[in-house]
Structures are given as structure tokens and as C-alpha cells.
């Protein structure tokens, strides 16, 4: 395990232990349920999306299935808008959020997050049509397309004088640029790496993030008052990683580059 990933695991365990020590092991919800209920937002390929058969598939869904097997439960995937996921998690309507959710300081104040994919994200990807070796500052574009509820949307919202157009799915964001409605879009690097293969007319450039805006990869969200469940999921992820299954899933979904 690399040093950065180890630091992320240590940070997670420290947070969970702090909850345990303050008596938060008394968890709400039905811990004896035979189902592992996972909330997702199926608009973020290859992590989760709806295939041609109308089924929710992707890297996260396969991982959720592996975790449910480790927990001895049946997987139950439920779709929500991205903005509603954390609320439903806190209300124990779902056991976990697995939806390509970035680990950020603001989210760590609300929920527990178990790292499972990626390391520090130090830049975002600017997407535009045609060739442009010297992109303009974001404030110079008439609008910037981005997906609702994502870290990149939150980052853009923190910048003054950037006109943002937010959409529910990555596909809508890219079509906004393809049709010339917004001159540029901003994507997370691993998403851009996969989805842009189907959009050869689009080009990219990088947007460096200030150090205090770096993201610690992707995490599985668990309600902060359910640390025992978080530890079980964390142990399952560790086993899945050690067995090589996580690497196989990354390869299957084109996330191992």
C-alpha cells in the first residue's frame, strides 16, 4: 500500500475510533437486516450507470456486490439524486453510499468515508471542442458545464465570477460542450479518462488545484453514528483488495491506467 493511501486509511480509522470511544457504537437502523442497502446515483460511468438493458451497472456496483457477499447479505441497490444521498444515509434509509463520491473535508464532517479507489486528486480536467493549447482562465468563459453534486461543482462554486451550468449526468455535461451551449466542461480525471474515449471531437487540458483543495480519492459513505458497520465494510474492502478482486474490477472497467 502506498504512503498516501495508507495515510487515508489511518485517517479513516482514527475518525471511526473517535466515535467508538465516545459511545457511538449504539447504532440506529436494523443491523440484523439480511440486505445490504446501497444508495447510488447511476449517472457516473464507469462507476455507475444504466446500461442498454436498463440495469444499473459499473465498478461501484460490482464492488458493492463483493462487499455484500463478505457481509453475508443480499445486495439492494437504490437510486437517488446525488444531493439526496447523504440525507438518506443519515436517516438510515440506506446502509452505505457507493457512487464515486470524493473524500473531502466537508463530507468528513458529515459522514464516515471508507477509501476504496484512487489517491490524491491534484487536478481536474477541462474539456472543450477542437484544439486549444492555451485554455483561458475559467472566469473568461461564458459558462462552464459540470455535474451536479460532484466535488468539481463545489470547487467551481468556490470561485468567484465563474458562471456554472450544472447537469444531472456526465453525458449531459459532455453534450452541452458538443452542442456548443457551453464552451468548456470540468470533469474528474478518472471519469474523463474513460468517457472521453467515446468523444474524439473533444480535447482536454488540466486545471491544477491548490493544495488545500486536493481530494483524497473516492470513499464509501456510512452514517457517522454507525461506526461498527463502517469497520465491517472497511474490513471487507481490505479483504477484497488483498485477494486481488479490486484490481480485477479496476481492469474490467478501465480504471487501472
UniProtKB/Swiss-Prot annotation:
Q: Which UniProt keywords apply?
A: Amino-acid transport, Secreted, Signal, Transport
**Gene Ontology biological-process entries:** amino acid transport
> So which domain of life are we looking at?
Bacteria
- Where along this sequence does the record place binding of L-arginine? 41, 48, 100, 102, 107, 151
Q: Which InterPro entries match?
A: ArtJ_PBP2 (IPR037297), Solute-binding_3/MltF_N (IPR001638)
Q: Where is the signal peptide?
A: 1-23
Major location (coarse): secreted
Q: Which GO terms describe its molecular function?
A: amino acid binding
List localization entries: Secreted; Cell surface
Could you name the Gene Ontology cellular component terms for this entry?
Answer: cell surface; extracellular region; outer membrane-bounded periplasmic space
State the PANTHER family in the record: ARGININE-BINDING EXTRACELLULAR PROTEIN ARTP, MEMBRANE-BOUND LYTIC MUREIN TRANSGLYCOSYLASE F
* Comment block on domains: Contains two domains, D1 and D2, which are both exposed on the surface and bind to epithelial cells.
What family is this protein classified in? Answer: Belongs to the bacterial solute-binding protein 3 family.
Q: What else is known?
A: Does not induce neutralizing antibodies.
What is this protein's function per UniProt?
Probably part of an ABC transporter complex involved in arginine transport. Binds arginine. Interacts with host epithelial cells, suggesting a role in host-cell adhesion during infection.
Record protein name field: Probable ABC transporter arginine-binding protein ArtJ
Name of the coding gene: artJ
